[in-house]
Amino acid sequence: MPASIQAAAYADTEIIFDWHKVEGFKGGSIDGIKVIVRGTDGAAQTMVGIDLLFATSHIPTPSDGNVSIIDVAPTTLGTTGAAVDTPGWFNNLVGYVPVAAGDFNDADLIYLNIANVNLAGEEIPVSGDLYVAAVAKGALDFRTTARVNETGFAAGAQTVITVDTKDITLGFAPGDVVHAVDDAVLGTIKTVDSATQITLTKANVDAIADSDIIYNVSPIQLILSGTV
């Protein structure tokens, strides 16, 4: 989810993320999904629904007896942060999972929300490469005020990054991939050292300017369970 798009709240019907290839799923079908959604500037969201779409790269050809499979990835839904406006993915679709606002827990976890979706009896078949995309059903807001507090530095310059304006521990954690609001890549967080400092796994990828607001580019996590 590009940092530059997260700089504004998502609205109903907007693409949260376009087709993302799922790596390492072992089952023959998906029978459950956990959806973890990070908060707004370190506080749990007022949750809205999220529509999850699943697609395959294997398109059957029943008119010729399925003697061949068309192996092609789904085409884009459109521009992230805007409504779906691009066709071509119709025959790749294999599943639709509406995750309602009421499926998520309340704000007891303070910093995020989580939902469990049981697909028993409505399992999503998996063959070929598996893809997932998401569309917002209301205002999802991943904006943050955490920003770099350094003299601007070149690509590959440092692993320790000082931040200010927001306690970084509230919205960021080890493993988060962090980009600046202009989509410049800092890198992956190794440790959150204090309220004002993070350490990356390796030196920053792109040049970074002082006061760049930073974003976790994967604020939504999906955990899929399946059966063989």
How should each PLM-predicted stretch be described?
Residues 16-55, 172-175:
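Beta-rich globular "head" domains
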Residues 16-27, 118-124, 164-168:
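Extracellular and analogous surface-interaction loops
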Residues 35-41, 56-62, 133-142, 181-182:
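Short, flexible beta-strand-to-coil junctions
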Residues 2-23, 40-48, 61-66, 78, ...:
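Surface-exposed ligand/attachment interfaces on beta-rich extracellular proteins
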Residues 143-216:
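Autoprocessing Asn-cyclization modules and mimics
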Residues 73-122:
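Extended, solvent-exposed segments with strong compositional bias
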Residues 38-92:
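Surface-exposed turn/loop modules enriched in turn-prone residues
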Residues 1-10, 119-146, 216-228:
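C-terminal interaction-tip segments
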